[in-house]
């Protein structure tokens, strides 16, 4: 496994891979890797000749400076995990390599609508940062496929739209959420939880399941369902942030013709903001 930190060296290897006709898969990450990331790597390995994992804590997508500072950086451990998985390349650039002139005045990629709704409304600029760094990685690495986790449901929808709108010839693969045995979705931010909070954390998944059962039963009193869910979360020790029930295919409000719903949930537990989602097929 080769660790690449500079753009010239990356371009040199990408040119060679293209000349050799290799099928390249990209797994973009911010590091602090867990089993959910490893599932992305496994999916990439099954679909391509060469797997490149990027590890870059992207300052452009953080809406709070304190969150950027405390985000876990575990490059050595990450590389050890990826080496065991027989990943071909790790691209781990410094911030100065990606943004040599700083963030002020930086050209960015914005996906209208999707970047400012739902999660984007509570985290201004976040999705603009995501779409910008992903487009930069696509331009640099020129992958045939790229793997993203379905845990970040809105992010995946945003990437798919950006790829379509910008005419990238890249297959976007969504990989299902990996959960702990108690239902908690794996996330790098779970590291912020204390031992006691970790015991409470699966409550978010349980509340989503309760919402799903109501939707499957035909209940469409969405505001009432959401209010009850928020109350349940608060009683469990969370601080409910945002719960939405949307059309899974458009992320717009549910209509009578919606075939699938997605429950999008975000809640604070101590210093950790946990997000999760669940899709439900609606009775027609």
Curated annotation (Swiss-Prot):
Superkingdom: Bacteria
Record's catalysed reaction(s): (R)-pantoate + beta-alanine + ATP = (R)-pantothenate + AMP + diphosphate + H(+)
Annotated protein name in UniProt: Pantothenate synthetase
InterPro entries per record: Cyt_trans-like (IPR004821), Pantoate_ligase (IPR003721), Pantoate_ligase_C (IPR042176), Rossmann-like_a/b/a_fold (IPR014729)
Main location as per UniProt: cytoplasm
Pathway: Cofactor biosynthesis; (R)-pantothenate biosynthesis; (R)-pantothenate from (R)-pantoate and beta-alanine: step 1/1
Amino-acid positions noted as binding (R)-pantoate in the UniProt annotation, renumbered to this chain: 61, 155
Compartments, record wording: Cytoplasm
CDD domains in UniProt: PanC
Disulphide bonds in the chain: none
Gene Ontology cellular component annotations, sorted alphabetically: cytosol
EC number: 6.3.2.1
Record family assignment: Belongs to the pantothenate synthetase family.
Binding site residues for beta-alanine: 61
Function description: Catalyzes the condensation of pantoate with beta-alanine in an ATP-dependent reaction via a pantoyl-adenylate intermediate.
Binding site for ATP: 30-37, 149-152, 178, 186-189
GO terms for biological process, alphabetical: pantothenate biosynthetic process
Keywords from the UniProt entry: ATP-binding, Cytoplasm, Ligase, Nucleotide-binding, Pantothenate biosynthesis
Note: The reaction proceeds by a bi uni uni bi ping pong mechanism.
Subunit comment: Homodimer.
Originating organism: Salmonella heidelberg (strain SL476)
Active-site feature positions: 37
